[in-house]
Amino acid sequence: GNTVGVLVADANRESIMKHVYAGNRLPVIGFSNNGSLRTPRLDMNGDGKVTVREVDSLMALQFKAAHETLTGRDVKRVLAEQFRRDDGRLERRWLGISSNVTYRYAECGTAGESGNADAGVDTDSGADTNADADECAADEHAAVRIANLAVDGRPIADDDLVIIASNSYLLQGGDSYPAFRAGTNYGELDMPYSQPLHEYLAAHQGLTAVVAVPVGTQA
């Protein structure tokens, strides 16, 4: 299912770069969520081709293609919201994240163990490590902290602005991702949220067999 999620996220990113923001000053990240995809398979009948009907069946809800702007700090909060603790185990719900994004994550330390919380994170500077530890301390519900966030190979600082491309449901905090609600400059396109994938598949023939690698590696 995550392979399709990454594909949809890449399509969302390309659509916003085509219809809304054609510049290169701000990085653009695409997101998709499992709650907006009705099946983990894009080629539902396995014939090696993806039809308009299959895309429309995959994405049949009444959402719009949408965009907003987040800070790097809020992007990290979104990424952290994929993770939950359940009976002491770390569980992950997969967001579809565009393939131009990389990051690392590590579990927040338990109470009284904050000194060990960042031991496993591969950070380049002590300042970054301290900032990440502060984020764990600031949100007692955080299961992980996010480090080394980069878009298109460029490190993203907490105060950097990032354009987010997704669907109207997710960007309004749907699927229990409230960090998206911190966004500014929210806007919806006059198109259903399936349209970016239609355009993407038309522009990139032969993508039906793509196997995307989920982003986000554990430290």
Describe each region flagged by the PLM:
Residues 1-122, 128-219:
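Catalytic centers of hydrolytic enzymes
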